[in-house]
A protein has these predicted regions:
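Alpha-helical transmembrane segments and their cytosolic interface
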Residues: 5, 137-177
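Hydrophobic alpha-helical transmembrane segments
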Residues: 9-13, 35, 57-61, 78, ...
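Short helix-perturbing small/polar motifs within transmembrane alpha-helices
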Residues: 81-116, 120
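Membrane-helix interface "capping/anchor" motifs
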Residues: 47-58, 95-101
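Interfacial aromatic-anchored transmembrane helix boundaries in multi-pass membrane proteins
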Residues: 24-33, 64-93
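Mid-bilayer segments of alpha-helical transmembrane spans in multi-pass integral membrane proteins
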Residues: 73, 108-124, 145-153
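Membrane-interface helix termini and inter-helical loops of multi-pass transporters
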Residues: 123-136
Length: 177
């Protein structure tokens, strides 16, 4: 099915609205903030699947700017801007690597670097309101990386469900592309 400009524009508007709803809810619903941010990130993948990489990037940028305008607590949107919002884009690019072992290695290094930066460089800014156990940083990074790989796996399952259910295409692999 050929995607018209009207279809792409409409889909972008719907994905942007849903993304903002999840970001906004994540900013004030206690206990499930990260779940809501993770759900908000799925719409970037939908845009990439339906319109290409440019559509996913545009959605991320629009949601980040609109979120900063709409969400009352500006720090509440930080997890979306710093990780969840662009993860679909990163996943798409990493999964273009032909070797599965290399893909996993790059993802682990990406998550570890991001967690290291967050825990060592910007702990108060990014995690100020989140209680983190007083474990050595290396254990927190290792545990966080395992959790992010689980997030990546679930993200892949949801993408595959979307493709089978809404695009009605076969799946040959667990790739976003």
């Amino acid at each position: 099915m050929k995607r018209t400009k009207t279809f792409k524009l409409t889909l972008g508007g719907i994905c942007l609205a849903l993304t903002i709803i999840f970001i906004y809810a994540g900013s004030f619903v206690p206990g499930i903030e990260l779940t809501l941010f993770a759900l908000s990130s799925l719409f970037t993948a939908v845009m990439i699947l339906e319109t290409g990489l440019g559509g996913g990037i545009l959605l991320y940028l629009a949601a980040s700017v609109l979120g900063l305008i709409i969400v009352p607590g500006k720090l509440a949107i930080t997890p979306y801007i710093c990780l969840f919002g662009y993860y679909g884009i990163v996943k798409y690019l990493i999964e273009k690597i032909p070797n599965a072992i290399a893909q996993i290695t790059v993802k682990v290094l990406f998550f570890a670097a991001l967690l290291c930066l967050g825990l060592l460089g910007f702990r108060e800014l990014l995690l100020g309101s989140i209680d983190i156990p007083d474990y050595p940083v290396i254990i927190l990074i290792a545990g966080g990386t395992v959790m992010m790989m689980l997030y990546d796996y679930i993200y892949t399952l949801v993408i595959n469900f979307y493709i089978r259910r809404f695009q009605k295409k076969g799946i040959d692999s667990m790739k976003l592309s």
